[in-house]
Amino acid sequence: MHTLNSEKETKNFAKLFAQNLKPNDIVLLNGDLGAGKTFFCREIIKHFCGKNTNIISPTFNLLQIYKTPNFNIYHYDMYRIKSPEEIYELGFEEALNGNLILIEWSEIIKHLLTPPLIEVNLKILDNNKRLCSIKKENFLFDFL
């Protein structure tokens, strides 16, 4: 578990985390509304696509795809999904072929996913302070 005391610390932590990701990784991001899931994803995407990449939250259209030189990043937001099967209408099977997948609000579809999965859990401690834990295959994942 890591205590992130500011937005800057969260940004740096997400950048370090991104350095450990590769194609075929599936990252599940969980936390209450406003915990920083999209913020965390934004830093991961910038790591691979460049800091000037225009990153749009997938909250309303459920999916944003970003291209890197070697793979795509599929950024899903499941907050408004009513049925787990809806993920297949969003190109999920295609996403599984050598791409990096980021899924916010993943609880509704987690049972459909095949391990290994990387789970990022963010908890609000106060205004800009967060508690972050990362698990991979039921083990705490510490890359620092």
Curated annotation (Swiss-Prot):
InterPro entries referenced in this protein's UniProt entry, alphabetically:
P-loop_NTPase, T6A_TsaE
Residues involved in Mg(2+) binding: T38, E104
This protein's GO CC annotations: cytoplasm
Binding-site residues for ATP, renumbered to this chain: E7, G34, A35, G36, K37, T38, F39
Entry keyword set:
ATP-binding, Cytoplasm, Magnesium, Metal-binding, Nucleotide-binding, tRNA processing
GO MF annotations for this entry? ATP binding; metal ion binding
Asked whether the UniProt record includes Magnesium among its keywords, one would answer: yes
Q: Name one GO biological process term.
A: tRNA threonylcarbamoyladenosine modification
Disulphide bonds in the chain = none
Compartment annotation: Cytoplasm
Per the record, the domain of life is: Bacteria
Q: Does the keyword RNA-binding apply?
A: no
Protein family per UniProt: Belongs to the TsaE family.
Q: What job does the chain carry out?
A: Required for the formation of a threonylcarbamoyl group on adenosine at position 37 (t(6)A37) in tRNAs that read codons beginning with adenine. Is involved in the transfer of the threonylcarbamoyl moiety of threonylcarbamoyl-AMP (TC-AMP) to the N6 group of A37, together with TsaD and TsaB. TsaE seems to play an indirect role in the t(6)A biosynthesis pathway, possibly in regulating the core enzymatic function of TsaD.
What name is this protein filed under? tRNA threonylcarbamoyladenosine biosynthesis protein TsaE
